[in-house]
Curated annotation (Swiss-Prot):
It catalyses: hydrogencarbonate + NH4(+) + ATP = carbamoyl phosphate + ADP + H2O + H(+). Pathway: Metabolic intermediate metabolism; carbamoyl phosphate degradation; CO(2) and NH(3) from carbamoyl phosphate: step 1/1. PANTHER family: CARBAMATE KINASE, CARBAMATE KINASE-RELATED. It comes from Staphylococcus aureus (strain NCTC 8325 / PS 47). This is Carbamate kinase 1. It holds the Pfam family AA_kinase.
């Protein structure tokens, strides 16, 4: 039996609640399949498209005097509940369909960051919708948002993405796992909070990379494997070129060389690779599997996906 953290990519969860629900239903079957094989799993997820849409919608309402504007921390909490609810319901239904009595809980999770993290001066986390170049330039002019080209898929707004330091609800997560509860935690990388005087916390405008928080969570609970599910089936070098090559098996040293060669795009694949390296360096006996949401079953059989070891 293995203990596994499964990190679902926000981009892989679709562009609407309806599309996301259908994708989540299929994912639930694969995740429950892991449980029936005796594995203990903890689920995390991204929220880039979702938190961007929530923030955009609420700010649009505020601009038209239809309600207050909401900070990113609160938008992150909303996205945790929205995505977590659909995952939780789909997993409960799938477990019920096979006669398995297991509680599923979505835990609103805060993650401490450093308010002096240089990321606050260098926004890099893509969120929200994809735009063409002209649309992005127009929005940037009107609202002052920063946009970058995102892995050949269009232009997206970017926000600060500080490094996760600690998971505030870690002991609660451990207690739930110990009591045989299927936990959905650290959604969207966690709600970013900074430590104040007397050990209080306060939310801050940012979106933490979910893979980096998932790696931290995996190391903290000493899991055997981190599975990062994204929109592509392998990690590639020379991505989106005629010479692109899938990496089927690789190791930390090789990945560090590829990082030096700028093989991985900032804001998309690079944080996943950095998370994988961090997880393995903190947990040398562990491994990382990176593949697409649709190929999870095949990846678990070793037919597809990138496997990373020390």
């Amino acid at each position: 039996m293995a203990k596994i953290v499964v990190a679902l990519g926000g981009n892989a969860l679709g562009k609407s609640p309806q599309e996301q629900l259908e994708l989540v239903k299929n994912t639930a079957k694969s995740l429950v399949g892991l449980i029936t094989k005796g594995h203990e799993i903890v689920i995390s997820h991204g929220n880039g498209p979702q938190v961007g849409s929530i923030n955009l919608g609420l700010n649009y309402a505020a601009e038209h005097n239809q309600g207050p504007a909401f900070p990113f921390a609160e938008c992150g909490a909303m996205s945790q509940a929205y995505i977590g609810y659909q995952l939780q319901e789909s997993l409960q239904n799938e477990l019920h369909s096979i006669g398995m009595d297991k509680q599923v809980v979505t835990l609103v999770t805060q993650v401490e960051v450093d308010e002096n993290d240089p990321a606050f001066n260098n926004p890099s986390k893509p969120i929200g919708l994809f735009y063409n170049k002209e649309e992005a330039e127009q929005i940037q002019k009107e609202k002052g948002f920063i946009f970058v080209e995102d892995a050949g898929r269009g232009y997206r707004r970017v926000v600060p993405s500080p490094q996760p330091i600690s998971i505030i609800e870690l002991e609660s997560i451990k207690t739930l796992i110990k009591n045989d509860t299927l936990v959905i935690a650290a959604g969207g990388g966690g709600i970013p909070v900074i430590r104040e005087q007397h050990d209080g916390f306060k939310g801050i405008d940012a979106v933490i990379d979910k893979d980096k928080t998932s790696a931290l969570l995996g190391a903290n609970i000493q899991c055997d494997q981190l599975i990062i599910l994204t929109a592509i089936d392998y990690v590639y070098i020379n991505f989106n070129t005629e010479n692109q090559q899938p990496l089927k098996t690789t190791n930390v040293d090789e990945l560090k060389r590829y990082i030096d060669e700028n093989q991985f795009a900032k804001g998309s694949m690079l944080p996943k690779i950095e998370a994988a390296i961090s997880f393995i360096e903190n947990n040398p006996k562990g491994s990382v599997l990176i593949t697409s949401l649709n190929e999870l079953d095949a990846a678990l059989e070793g037919k597809v996906g990138t496997v990373i070891k020390k």
